[in-house]
């Protein structure tokens, strides 16, 4: 069977499963999620052993530290996945809810009912936990999902998908509502992108090259989880110690993830007080600074060799590493102009104690999450109370930001009549 034929087979099965999922009760869907949590606990040794095979192969292939970090499963991450299953199971079921209702002069009762999207294809790289996060959200929302993870995580994803399908069957739901693509290579992805007769939406989550490739190839709607070029802007009135903690957390905690900080913008009136603190604390944690000409002399507290002159290509760059671009700006206007030019609509942060400035930044910074005096690392479905996320949409249709259960549904009009006909 060719890759195209295999993708068509998966697509047809998913389409049938999606119809079955529209009949699934909230109790059956929740049973699948809670059963999955139990199975993940029981199968943890086997899943971690499969992950160890992937990590060994990735190291042998010379993968960098950021990719190895995203690939790695630990007992703590397994516990997070189990907690996500339980949390999503306890969320309200959006399917079938009537959001609004009104009566027309002719007596017709009109409403909008929330329904599943249908079949969702998820194309992602490296992170095996996405296999579970994506699947549980799709199941809760009554969708079928086709999962295509990166080839570097094939053993991990296979073990997780088998566990997932077992939980589905135990709950009386079709195993084909959550299928994993095991065919390697770009030909399978390209074929998947053409199955608009089966797939209702495709979600690419990974590097810029992957997202662009899927967006250009897809014949169905795309929800893009694009790159995270996240900025923090520091106003002169900010609490600098608090701002330092926010910048440190955003850059150092997990530098390889999409909500990590990539660029620090500092108002000129705060630069001389703030940048030495940044250089000392983040420099000691191993951060390399790409500083503009104004910032360079203010960062001499960094370890030797950790501050280098900024190049044009350092702006708008997602480093996936302990690297931070630093720029001094004259005003909030200049900071917002910089964000508009170099940002990726992911996450933008301001540190200020001025309410009017904070509200202006919230209004004008164009990103899926804009925060005041809080870390960029909070742009995450779990941290925002969604339980888990299938991705962070950086496109405004049909969702913008972290996508939880409700974002994996849509609405249809429902009309209740008593024999009315149009005049």
Curated annotation (Swiss-Prot):
It is an enzyme of class 1 (oxidoreductase). CDD domains: ALDH_F18-19_ProA-GPR. Pathway: Amino-acid biosynthesis; L-proline biosynthesis; L-glutamate 5-semialdehyde from L-glutamate: step 2/2. The keyword Oxidoreductase applies. Keywords: Amino-acid biosynthesis, Cytoplasm, NADP, Oxidoreductase, Proline biosynthesis. Catalyzes the NADPH-dependent reduction of L-glutamate 5-phosphate into L-glutamate 5-semialdehyde and phosphate. The product spontaneously undergoes cyclization to form 1-pyrroline-5-carboxylate. This is Gamma-glutamyl phosphate reductase. It comes from Desulfovibrio desulfuricans (strain ATCC 27774 / DSM 6949 / MB). The gene is proA.
């Amino acid at each position: 069977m060719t890759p195209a034929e295999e993708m068509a087979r998966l697509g047809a099965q998913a389409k049938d499963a999606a119809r079955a999922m529209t009949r699934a009760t909230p109790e059956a869907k929740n049973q699948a999620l809670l059963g999955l949590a139990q199975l993940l606990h029981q199968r943890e040794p086997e899943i971690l052993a499969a992950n160890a095979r992937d990590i060994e192969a990735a190291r042998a292939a010379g993968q960098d530290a950021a990719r190895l970090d995203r690939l790695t499963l630990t007992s703590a991450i397994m516990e997070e996945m189990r907690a996500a299953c339980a949390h999503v199971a306890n969320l309200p079921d959006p399917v079938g809810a009537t959001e609004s209702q009104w009566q027309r002069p002719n007596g017709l009762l009109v409403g909008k009912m929330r329904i599943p999207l249908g079949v969702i294809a998820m194309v992602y790289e490296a992170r095996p936990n996405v296999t579970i996060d994506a699947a549980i959200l799709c199941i809760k929302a009554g969708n079928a999902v086709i999962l295509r993870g990166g080839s570097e995580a094939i053993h991990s994803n296979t073990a997780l998908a088998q566990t997932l399908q077992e939980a589905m069957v135990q709950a009386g739901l079709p195993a084909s509502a959550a299928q994993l693509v095991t065919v390697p290579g770009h030909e399978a992805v390209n074929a998947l992108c053409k199955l608009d007769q089966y797939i209702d939406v495709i979600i690419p989550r990974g590097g810029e090259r992957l997202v662009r490739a899927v967006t250009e190839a897809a014949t169905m709607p795309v929800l893009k989880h694009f790159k995270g070029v996240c900025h923090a802007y520091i106003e002169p009135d900010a609490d600098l110690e608090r701002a330092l903690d926010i910048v440190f957390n955003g850059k150092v905690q997990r530098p390889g993830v999409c909500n990590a900080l990539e660029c620090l913008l500092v108002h000129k009136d705060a630069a001389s007080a703030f940048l030495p603190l940044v250089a000392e604390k983040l420099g000691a944690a191993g951060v390399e600074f790409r500083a503009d000409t104004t910032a360079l002399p203010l960062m001499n507290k960094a370890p030797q060799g950790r501050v280098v002159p900024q190049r044009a290509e350092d702006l708008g760059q997602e480093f996936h590493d302990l690297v931070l671009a630093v720029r001094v700006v004259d005003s909030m206007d200049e900071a917002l102009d910089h964000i508009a030019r170099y940002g990726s609509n992911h996450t933008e942060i301001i540190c200020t104690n001025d309410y009017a400035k904070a509200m202006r930044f919230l209004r004008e910074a164009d990103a899926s999450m804009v925060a005041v005096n809080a870390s960029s690392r909070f742009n995450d479905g779990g941290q925002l109370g969604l339980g888990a996320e299938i991705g962070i949409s950086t496109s405004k249709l049909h969702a913008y930001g972290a996508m939880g259960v409700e974002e994996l549904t849509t609405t249809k009009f429902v009309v209740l009549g008593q024999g009315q006909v149009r005049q």
